[in-house]
Amino acid sequence: MMLKPAVDVSWGDYTVTLTAIVGLSKMVQSSDNWDYFINLSASDFPLLPQAELTEVLGRYADAGLSFVEGVPLNEKNRVEVMIDDQGLYREKQTTNAGRSLKVGKPRLPPSESMFTVFKGEFWVILHRSFCEYIEASPDNVARSFQAYFSRFRISDESYFQTVLCHALAPSFPDNLRFVSWPPVSEGHYDLHPDPITRDNVDEAIQSGALFARKFDTEVSKGAYAILKESLSLADPDRLGRAVNRLAPAADVGGREKFCAIPERYSIQEVREIFV
C-alpha cells in the first residue's frame, strides 16, 4: 500500500503510528481481496517466496489470527510528558518538523484497573478482521487509544498491541521476524538490531520466520546474495520450517501469554477516558 501524497513522519512520534493506521484503513476501504496487513520496513527481506508466504498465513486466515508480540509496559518515561509531533500539522518539511516538543504532563489513567499498555515491535502481521475493527472502531476503543497514544513516545511499539489485547482479538505472540539484537550489556541496550550478514544469514534461514531484518545496503550485500539464491531454489524444508514455527498457533490461545487484562477492566471505562 503506497500512501499518496507522502506524509511527514517524525521518528518516535505519533505520525509513525498514524501512517500505518491510515494505510490499513485505505486497504480495508479499497479491497476485500486480502487477509493480512503485513507491516514491513525498508530494511526487511522475505525468507520465503510469495507463494509460500501465502500458503503459511492462509492456514490461519479463517481463524482471524494476528501475529503480534507484546509484554505489559512498565516504563513510565514514555508517558510522563506530552509529545507535540509537528509532523501532524506542518504543511512543509522544515528542520524542526522532525523534532518533538515536551509540552507538559498528560493525564494518565486514574488507576491500573482501567487499562494496560503493552509494548512490542511495530513490525506486525494483522488479520483483516482486526484491521476492520481499528478502521471502524465500533465500540470507540480503537479510536480512544489513538487519542491516548498521540501523546505517547514511540507509540508505534504499543498501539496495535494494546488495542489487540483490549479488543480480545485472536492473536499469536510471534511477529514471525528474525532479528539479530546485539548482546545486552549492564545498564545499556541498543535501540536498533545488528545488520544481517554472512555470519548469521543461515540462522535467519533456519529460523522458520517469514521475514528477517535489518538489511543494510552495504554491510548485508553478502547475506542478500545468499538469500536471493536460496529463494530461487525449490526447497520443501523451507516451507516446513515456517509451518513448524507456527504450529502452536493452531490452538488460537496465544494471546494469554502477553495480554494480561486487569480483572476489573471495562470497555465502558476506556470509552470514558477522555470525557
Question: Where are the regions a protein language model picked out?
Answer:
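ER/Golgi luminal nucleotide-sugar-dependent glycosyltransferases, focusing on the catalytic module
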Residues: 1-275
